[in-house]
């Protein structure tokens, strides 16, 4: 199962085992998104209504309306204010790295003079604005441990953005 095929805005592949005693009448869910179905929910679709932030900034008001099915779902019942939308504060060198990268690029695409010397291929990597996110990990806001750099704002993801990419409604506390 890949969560992106069911309207979740991230690639998240998992194996699901169903154990049943007796009759085998379990009906597996049918994917709702993908080729020939609804389009995948992209990063832009999922977080495009949130205010732009710089490193260390926060915001409490939505920047746009809930203009798609996903946003109407996550914003239902949330009111007028957005919570937990604060960007982690980063140092000047990391900010320069994040500003240099383009959509989908990683540390391997950086000039030698600012390229981190260690880390896996998907570290210090920028997400794609027009695609679903890669799988979220517990370090979803740490550029040195995952592909988590915001493609528009050149910063790490906020908690609200991480929650959105897991389809957690905005009113969840």
Segments from the language model and where they lie:
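C-terminal target-recognition/interaction regions appended to catalytic cores
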Residues: 65-173
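Class I S-adenosyl-L-methionine
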Residues: 1-116
């Amino acid at each position: 199962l890949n969560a992106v095929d069911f309207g979740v805005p991230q690639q998240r592949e998992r194996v699901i085992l169903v154990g049943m005693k007796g009759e085998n009448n379990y009906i597996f869910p049918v994917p709702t998104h993908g080729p020939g179905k609804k389009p995948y929910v992209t990063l832009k679709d999922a977080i495009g209504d949130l205010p732009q932030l710089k490193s260390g900034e926060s915001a409490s008001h939505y920047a746009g309306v809930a203009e798609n099915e996903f946003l109407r779902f996550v914003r239902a019942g949330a009111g007028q204010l957005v919570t937990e939308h604060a960007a982690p504060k980063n140092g000047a060198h990391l900010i320069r790295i994040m500003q240099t990268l383009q959509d989908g690029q990683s540390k391997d695409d950086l000039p030698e003079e600012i390229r981190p010397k260690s880390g896996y291929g998907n570290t210090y990597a920028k997400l794609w604005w027009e695609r679903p996110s890669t799988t979220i990990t517990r370090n979803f806001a740490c550029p040195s441990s995952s592909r988590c750099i915001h493609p528009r704002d050149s910063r790490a993801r906020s908690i609200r953005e991480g929650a959105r990419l897991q389809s957690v409604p905005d009113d969840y506390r």
